């Protein structure tokens, strides 16, 4: 998970770990890409607006790597152009997009749909 909002990262981590998922987290796109290259993840949850490297740059970089993780892009906070950047994220290869704020159950539903058999055990 890559998001510069530590409170949100914590809430998402708690929900995902409670559902049985292992969670890696980074506060910016640069650190997140490094973590993905070192640890790898089946699914990457990425915020669009982050310091260092934004979510669109991260998605471009992840699409160039092997193996390609499943990507869920998120954005919110009432930012101008939020829908447009999520559409851009989808065009770049994000499998799904989420508008913040969202309920943990919404995120879990998306993850289960995307990972299918690779879901948490």
Regions found by a protein language model. Name each.
Residues 74-76:
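Hydrophobic/aromatic residues positioned on beta-strands within the core alpha/beta folds
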Residues 50:
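Receiver (REC) domain active-site loop signature in two-component systems and cognate sites
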Residues 57, 78-98, 105, 109:
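Alpha4 helix (beta4-alpha4-beta5 surface) of REC/receiver domains from two-component response regulators
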Residues 20-27, 35:
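Short hydrophobic/Thr-rich beta-strand motif most characteristic of the beta2 strand and flanking loop
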Residues 1-7, 12-16, 44:
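Conserved acidic segment of CheY-like receiver
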Residues 37-39, 61-69, 92:
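Conserved phosphotransfer cores of two-component systems
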Residues 28-31, 54-58:
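Acidic catalytic/metal-coordinating carboxylates
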Residues 47:
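Active-site residues of response regulator receiver
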């Amino acid at each position: 998970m890559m998001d510069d909002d530590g409170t949100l990262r914590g809430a998402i981590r708690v929900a995902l770990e409670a559902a049985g998922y292992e969670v890696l987290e980074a506060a910016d796109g640069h650190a997140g890409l490094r973590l993905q290259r070192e640890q790898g993840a089946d699914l990457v949850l990425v915020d669009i607006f982050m310091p260092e490297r934004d979510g669109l740059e991260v998605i471009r970089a992840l699409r160039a790597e092997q193996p390609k993780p499943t990507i869920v892009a998120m954005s919110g906070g009432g930012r101008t152009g939020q829908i447009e950047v999520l559409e851009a994220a989808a065009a770049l290869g994000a499998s799904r997009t989420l508008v913040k704020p969202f309920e943990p159950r919404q995120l879990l539903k998306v993850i289960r749909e995307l990972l299918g058999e690779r879901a948490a055990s």
